[in-house]
């Protein structure tokens, strides 16, 4: 029977006989004595096996990652032999009995190696998860979800499960579809979120709901996205935006303090979407970076340089400047690198002015004139030694290009403040206008606008929504809104999205019917647990905080999925595969 965990042993246990279980983290032979570093979920303890031990010959066969049961006596390590890197570094276990519970093939990589490729780590994920890093991250994740549940319970929220097999609805990404065997030719969809069901729970009178739930989105993957992801989903009736934000802020503040001992401060600041885009180029501003984007349209409207004057005179375009402190030392080679970087976001170039000791220097000086240059320097508060980058194009392109350049420069030049920086982003546009003039919701079709239905029909392109996002260190960790609770408004929004009456009835009929039976005002929020964990642990990717993640191509290297399905099963599901022809 196990008496202690490896990592819990210390000087207080000296003289005690203990029984431990675990894996061989490392095996060493020194002067005829065998040393084993035994690892379990709490840490590592050193075991020493002397040649006179009856199990010495057995110990000689032991290799890394063998699973052992060891009985022995705790003794103090000799002078000069302690290991300050281990919590157990002042003691060791003098083995009495050794039992091999299981052997191990030679492992394809050292468990705690930092140079192992991600492909190998994911293919042998069960080995990768044995590392201290992954063990600690997943334990932290467990503490986070435990705190969330406790907070929700303390505030009278009910944990209610919602269906995974549900109806396909347009929520901004492609659905994962599940064919129905019993209803030939028909499909379920895996939920992109529990959105409609949690609203139905509010209509059912539960008032406060939460769930830590898996969601599924078939979309292009990035470093911070997975096809299946986990979120804390929250919905509540009879609360305003500010009341919901205050409660969720309280939970976030307590979570960071308890789990990683970070004080996020009281009263998170708030910024409007419009200000965030104007000053930071993105709707998830990283407030650890002091650099701001400055609009310079007015002073560029009359210049002869059409690259600037053109966008400066159009309503949907802008000319903006980004000052980089001490950036004049950036080499031409790196400026070319940044020019290529902003082209990813549609920018056609990256103009700049360096403020050297001898004055401004730039290929564009001759097009602007001294007065305009002086005004730009004044508006950006630039000093000798700085560099000013420019963006001039459609507002969307300029915002994305300079917003992402701002973050990249901060990484390259180490311009981050060390303090954590939470901020609420509010007053989002209700709709985004597509290139073809069609409307798309900025969040989802169930977000309440800040105006009534009649006004919304007239001002759809400028109307704001009652939505809010929580951003920490430039990452959106949560988002929510007040929901539409009146059927006329819901129909108006769906029609503005170009959805026909028949499609509205087919896809949302059940939901619209429920709105007619005394739906309370309600709202909510969802926290992306995976992204939150990435921020709290400092991981580079969500794949590093999920036990069994998918790759960037939505594949699982461990189980070699997705896989083909037998023809027999396809026939049972009434599914026919029609693959596109290869070029």
Curated annotation (Swiss-Prot):
Which major enzyme category is it?
ligase
Q: Where in the cell is it found?
A: Cytoplasm
In terms of CDD domains, this protein maps to:
AspRS_core, EcAspRS_like_N
Query: Which reaction equations make up its catalytic activity?
Result: tRNA(Asx) + L-aspartate + ATP = L-aspartyl-tRNA(Asx) + AMP + diphosphate
Renumbered residue ranges of the record's region Aspartate: 195-198
Q: Name one GO molecular function term.
A: ATP binding
Q: Which UniProt keywords apply?
A: Aminoacyl-tRNA synthetase, ATP-binding, Cytoplasm, Ligase, Nucleotide-binding, Protein biosynthesis
Q: Which SUPFAM superfamilies match?
A: Class II aaRS and biotin synthetases, GAD domain-like, Nucleic acid-binding proteins
Task: State the Gene3D superfamilies in the record.
Answer: Bira Bifunctional Protein, Domain 2 (3.30.930.10), GAD-like domain (3.30.1360.30), Nucleic acid-binding proteins (2.40.50.140)
Give residues annotated as binding L-aspartate.
171, 217, 443, 483
Q: What Pfam family is a match, any one?
A: tRNA-synt_2
Q: What is its main location?
A: cytoplasm
Q: Which domain of life is it from?
A: Bacteria
- Site (Important for tRNA non-discrimination) residue list: 30, 80
Instruction: Give the EC number(s) listed in the UniProt record.
Output: 6.1.1.23
What InterPro entries does this protein's entry cite?
Aa-tRNA-synt_II, aa-tRNA-synth_II, aa-tRNA-synth_II/BPL/LPL, Asp-tRNA-ligase_1, Asp-tRNA-ligase_1_N, Asp/Asn-tRNA-synth_IIb, AspRS_core, GAD-like_sf
Which positions are annotated as binding ATP?
217-219, 226, 476, 528-531
Subunit organization: Homodimer.
Protein family per UniProt: Belongs to the class-II aminoacyl-tRNA synthetase family. Type 1 subfamily.
Name the PANTHER family on file. Answer: ASPARTATE--TRNA LIGASE, MITOCHONDRIAL (PTHR22594:SF5), ASPARTYL/LYSYL-TRNA SYNTHETASE (PTHR22594)
What is this protein's function? Aspartyl-tRNA synthetase with relaxed tRNA specificity since it is able to aspartylate not only its cognate tRNA(Asp) but also tRNA(Asn). Reaction proceeds in two steps: L-aspartate is first activated by ATP to form Asp-AMP and then transferred to the acceptor end of tRNA(Asp/Asn).
Q: What is this protein called?
A: Aspartate--tRNA(Asp/Asn) ligase
Q: What gene does the UniProt entry assign to this protein?
A: aspS
